[in-house]
Amino acid sequence: MKPLVRLATLCAIAALPVHVCAQGAAPAAGQSAAQTQAYPNKPLKIVVPFFAGSDLDPVARGLGDHFTTTWGQHYVVENKGGANGQIGTGYVAKSAPDGHTLLICSPGPITINPNLQTNLPYTVGKDIVPVSLIATAPMVLVASARVPARNYAEFATYLKTNPGKAFFASAGVGNVTHLAAELFLRQAGLSAVHTPYKGAQSVIADLLGGHVDFYFNPLPSARTYIKDHPDKVRALAVTSLERSPHLPDVPTLNELGLKGFDVNSWYGLCAPGGTPQPVITKLNGETTRALSGGELPGRLRGFGMSPQATTPEQFDEHIRKESAQWAAIIKEKNIKPE
């Protein structure tokens, strides 16, 4: 994460009203300082805006366990999937801004949907505000064994000599697995045909079955089948600037010649707009403590993630930068929602 850029400067650059960039409004009228200090005073609801089984589930449970241990309040993880995270994110946006309903956020609902959809039930920065990044994970360029390539160089040569004949899969139009592939193809000067699926599990089944040629898969969900099926798929590269300790023998696209290529899946904590600033601060501080020691960092690493806490302002900067990147790709490729 780059050094902190003051939020006021970011707002000025983006020509946005200050209230849109605020990380949490002042406590609402009638809410006493004592109430804020007593937070949390009832069980927490941590919403995952995807169906059960996504990479976000262990993040939600790990953070919830820490909050319960620290604050003595129980929590429930509620999966509200659908529309690439829109439904669950919209639910949190409309929830009471008291810090008791929280969102585990990720690129789809936060940096992609606002650039792809025209009628979102929320505005990022106004209805949904960042609290802290929690973890990041690179994506893995996974090729089917049907592709005659044992490494990235051979893979790139295959695509170059067979323009428009290779097929890449995604978990859906506009999904981060789609946009990462488009960014790769643009930067590498290659071409391939997009084959969108309705969810990652279908992609993985067809990738293992040899029905598609390659897929950019977040490491947490890719690492198991890569290791279990070396005869069916090959991990050719990772999308982070540095190699992953989970796949130490797999090079980065950056070191393979795509200088500066850096695309990561990430997992963060967000809250409803209007959440009192003292509550945002308390949540951020406890998230930072959770990621600095204890059980949570080890649990996240066990899923292929790298723990990374930020201030709300740093997380906001990260969101803005990534949103601009995806906006450019969506416009250039004329990507439309299904």
Label each PLM-derived region with a short phrase.
Residues 17-19:
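N-terminal signal peptide c-region/cleavage motif recognized by signal peptidases
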Residues 94-100, 107, 115-202, 253-255, ...:
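Hinge/capping helix and adjacent helix->loop/strand transition within the periplasmic-binding protein
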Residues 104-109, 200, 216-222, 238-241, ...:
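Beta->alpha turn/N-cap motifs
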Residues 27, 31, 35, 41-43, ...:
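An extracytoplasmic/periplasmic, membrane-proximal ligand-sensing/linker region
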Residues 23-126, 165, 173, 177, ...:
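N-terminal (or domain-start) structured segment
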Residues 123-133, 169, 191-195, 213-214, ...:
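Short beta-strand->loop
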Residues 2-10:
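Sec-dependent signal peptide recognition
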